[in-house]
A protein has these predicted regions:
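Electropositive phosphate-/nucleotide-binding environments in soluble metabolic enzymes
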Residues: 2, 78, 82, 109, ...
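Conserved anion-binding
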Residues: 3-7, 13-100
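Conserved, mostly hydrophobic/aromatic
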Residues: 8, 63, 88, 104, ...
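A short hydrophobic/small-residue beta-strand
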Residues: 15, 40, 122-123, 129
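Expand to "…catalyze enediolate/carbanion chemistry for C-C bond making/breaking, isomerization
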Residues: 24, 28-31, 96, 108, ...
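C-terminal helical cap(s) of enzyme catalytic domains, especially alpha/beta-barrels
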Residues: 33, 116, 128-152
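Short Gly/Pro-enriched loop/turn and capping motifs at secondary-structure junctions
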Residues: 69-71, 106-109, 129-130
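Acidic, divalent-metal-coordinating active-site segment for phosphoryl/phosphodiester hydrolysis
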Residues: 106-118
């Protein structure tokens, strides 16, 4: 992935997200992203234990919890990922860290609200928004569902 960092930075990317499943490459990739002056995101796939991200939490700006297996849109939300979001939020509070928690995959009004209650801050929604006839209304409804789930 590092071959794309500089072109993305030059194109105006503010943040670059790498997968924790890259293992021993993670520290050097984080460093390369930071050298470019960009925010660092770390993604975790559904089958990977949340503990895999623990060594990097103080080095990242965003934790992206994948709530579907990456590869194609329209998949159903994997509810077993909710405890990962809860744990990530607990660690953020316990360690006084400031990374954002984002979720990607199967996000609907219902699952978005569930993720918000679990501690997610941002939501990546595809099919539930772009598969509707009225995008503006769908976005408004998702925002309302999330904000009602966790009054801030």
């Amino acid at each position: 992935p590092e071959i794309l960092f500089e072109p993305f930075a030059k194109a105006g990317a503010d943040e670059m997200i790498i997968h924790v499943e890259l293992g021993e490459q993670i520290p050097s990739l984080i460093k390369e992203i930071k050298v470019l002056g960009k925010e660092v995101g770390l993604a975790i796939n559904p089958p990977t234990a949340i503990a895999a991200v623990l060594p990097y939490l103080d080095q990242i700006d965003l934790l992206l919890v994948m709530t579907v297996n990456p590869g194609f849109g329209g998949q159903e939300f994997i509810r077993e990922c909710l405890p990962k979001i809860q744990q990530a939020a607990a660690w953020r509070n316990e360690k006084a860290l400031s990374y954002r928690i984002s979720v990607d995959g199967g996000i609907t009004n219902e699952t978005g609200a569930d993720c918000a209650r679990a501690g997610a801050d941002t939501f990546v929604a595809g099919t539930s928004l772009f598969g509707t006839r009225n995008l503006k209304s769908a976005v408004t409804q998702l925002r309302q569902s999330v904000s009602e789930a966790v009054p801030r």
